[in-house]
Amino acid sequence: MRPPHASDETSAGRRRFLGLAAAGAAGVLLAPGIELIEVARAAGPHKAAGSGADAGVRWGMLIDTTRCASGCTECVTACNVENGLDARPTPTSAQWIRKVDLEPVGIGLPLSLPVMCQHCAEPPCVDVCSTGASFKRVDGIVLVDRHTCIGCRYCMMACPYKARSFVHEPLEHQKPDVPRGKGCVESCTLCVQRIDRGEHTTACAEACADTGHGAIVFGNLNDPDSEISRRVREISTRALRADLALDPGVRYHGI
């Protein structure tokens, strides 16, 4: 014969199970976004991150403004071609990289520099994303999962560098390895498609080198023997908006 308390334990266990099941169902009915967010975070970003991501690597850039020529936009053109952006941009076209001319107060020497997603170690765009569409790979690259992005644009407001764009218009002539989508937010990916193919250079750095300026150096910041690490040790560098303590992966010399 069963102990008299066995049926009580079984009933209690059944009630707990049914209670959890009901709570789960209520969660789906009342707040479907919660479950979708968890699914997106568990599957979407990790799948989108690709098998090429290496936790021992931190990809980054060094921009030497003393070598960056005012009026030169070869880096912008190369980025547009590589990623299938508009060859003739309109006011609403996406900009993954843009040239900015500055004249620092008290110095009087104009500066020209490219600004793109800074691939922060503490990215505010990821913090504010309600669906998990904005995420950071283990190798430091900050990306957007376009299957999960709902176009709320909170990340655009959170980015202190204004480095993200919203796709307003239908897209044509997309690159197979650079999927994009109307109604989504996007930004510089450090040419992640190249990295995952084993190529260790970005289109903008390659184009800048071809001009002879060599103002953009791309590489692994965690490798002490990489060119970017050697250059960072040899010259003074700063981050844009260093006061925010976001630890950007893009460093600048000469600002």
Which residues fall in each region the model found?
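Cysteine-centered iron-sulfur cluster-binding motifs in ferredoxin-type domains/subunits
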Residues: 62-82, 109-132, 143-162, 180-211, ...
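Asp/Glu-centered strand-loop micro-motifs enriched in Gly/Pro and often flanked by an aromatic residue
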Residues: 5-9, 46-54, 67, 102-108, ...
